Amino acid sequence: MDKRHDPSRRIIAPTGTKLSCKSWLTEAPMRMLMNNLHPDVAERPEDLVVYGGIGRAARDWECYDKIVEVLQRLEDDETLLVQSGKPVGVFKTHSNAPRVIIANSNLVPHWANWEHFNELDKKGLAMYGQMTAGSWIYIGSQGIVQGTYETFVAMAKQHFGGSSKGKWILTGGLGGMGGAQPLAGTMAGYSVLTCEVDETRIDFRLRTRYVDKKATTLDEALAMIDEANASGKPVSVGLLANAADVFAELVERGITPDVVTDQTSAHDPLNGYLPQGWTLEQAAQMRKTDEAAVVKAAKQSMAVQVKAMLALQAAGSATTDYGNNIRQMAFEEGVENAFDFPGFVPAYVRPLFCEGIGPFRWAALSGDPEDIYKTDAKVKELIPDNPHLHNWLDMARERIAFQGLPSRICWVGLKDRARLALAFNEMVNNGELSAPVVIGRDHLDSGSVASPNRETESMLDGSDAVSDWPLMNALLNTASGATWVSLHHGGGVGMGFSQHSGVVIVADGTDDAAARLGRVLWNDPATGVMRHADAGYDIAKDCAKEQGLDLPMLEK
């Protein structure tokens, strides 16, 4: 019997102001853990899988129950340690220490590969935490919508003279991360064709308004795209098909999309990518009987897809890797020029990282959408001169369906995170908000990740693989008083290819919270500016000087 599987479980986080724990500092991690497993949030909540192949919130159901039990009894001078989804210890600390410290799927580098991890996973000794699955701050597909939107807007500026009118995107994957692409694309003015092998995922994205239409043949999907481009009204289409088949077929037909990318779970060839010609049922069975054959077949199909992406790039498509390590998988299968198209971070996002700008997010523990709308208004009030940001907030309110607890993603940087957080804390204090909010971010941020095939690809000084930075980020956030801090391995791109840290802090309206918020939400993005300044980026050096960062080796 698999201790991770229980179809009878239906987890819904409590809402309102009644506490199940001894304070908001422990109530918040409990609610956010539960929210990660909400049926509208998680991909396979009955298996504790939140997103990204096998990204879990807890190691098994026994561990989940024990985490909740401990959080409900935890005092405000105690810290719970969670090791790969298992609560292993409670220790006396102090009131400004984190209430929870999490480490997920970390392996000594020589053994940091899927084969070793999968053996540990089978024995119940490890858990893959992805990025925000095991750190309890996943907010559904909204969590990546704005970053994807910003990337697509940047692509329009770089490749199409600033206009996406009549342009269309080809991509793959409608899981927890990939599901953001169709909505982000149409928000940015493109039509989007997304290939997905699991019809239930297409239906889920239709229900939550991330996808506009479903197609079962390529001809049907292309007709929908053509009609939308002719009418000037962008459309997103979920096509029930294997991405490798479709990408290769478009090359064969001589059809060239304007933008090509992919967000299948290629980072995990065993669990995340369906080989060409296989059914979902066949793959599920083969994973039990012949893992090596599944991995081999999946990587061969990825090689087909990447070859097609390279061919489409040569035909004129703006082509980018959206951070799932598909280029690496294809390279290992003999596609020697797999890295001829760039990753999205060095191509489009790094200038933002240089100013500490990244995926700042918050969730309303009240469960009341009005609390989010009030914070949206506060962001506009405090950042009045950023029409692009205002436009994002307006579109998000109009077009993004909340999944689980109401939440918002908003890319802001060093200059703004702490002051927004302090304003939210004051809104809790004066009763404008009906309950506290939690403030966190993705691990995909400027100072919190080392990932040579994604966030730290092609660093100016060649320091792509140096992972001191996310370790220092986690330690500094712990010292600064975050409510929970996490340190993970393998998120986004798979085992052996990344290390990264997460941070979440509660704004409960108290003066103590204000002090912690001021420290954490200044120091956290400041580490991103520091990391990029150290690598030699002028934008980061200028930002560090403007903001008065004390970086001893930076020339004054």
From Swiss-Prot:
Annotated catalysed reactions: 4-imidazolone-5-propanoate = trans-urocanate + H2O
Residues binding NAD(+), per UniProt: 52-53, 130, 176-178, 196, 201, 242-243, 263-267, 273-274, 322, 492
Cellular component per GO, a single term: cytoplasm
Cofactor(s) it depends on: NAD(+)
Subcellular location: Cytoplasm
E.C. code: 4.2.1.49
Root EC class: lyase
Pfam families: Urocanase, Urocanase_C, Urocanase_N
Region forming the signal peptide: none
Active-site annotation: 410
InterPro entries: Urocanase, Urocanase-like, Urocanase_C, Urocanase_central_sf, Urocanase_CS, Urocanase_N, Urocanase_Rossmann-like, Urocanase_sf
Keyword Ribonucleoprotein: no
GO function terms (MF aspect): urocanate hydratase activity
Primary location recorded for the protein, binned into one broad class: cytoplasm
GO terms for biological process, alphabetical: L-histidine catabolic process to glutamate and formamide; L-histidine catabolic process to glutamate and formate
UniProt keywords, alphabetically: Cytoplasm, Histidine metabolism, Lyase, NAD
Pathway this chain belongs to: Amino-acid degradation; L-histidine degradation into L-glutamate; N-formimidoyl-L-glutamate from L-histidine: step 2/3
Cofactor note: Binds 1 NAD(+) per subunit.
Function of the protein: Catalyzes the conversion of urocanate to 4-imidazolone-5-propionate.
Family designation: Belongs to the urocanase family.
Name under which the protein is recorded: Urocanate hydratase
Source organism of this protein record: Shewanella piezotolerans (strain WP3 / JCM 13877)
Lineage: Bacteria, Pseudomonadati, Pseudomonadota, Gammaproteobacteria, Alteromonadales
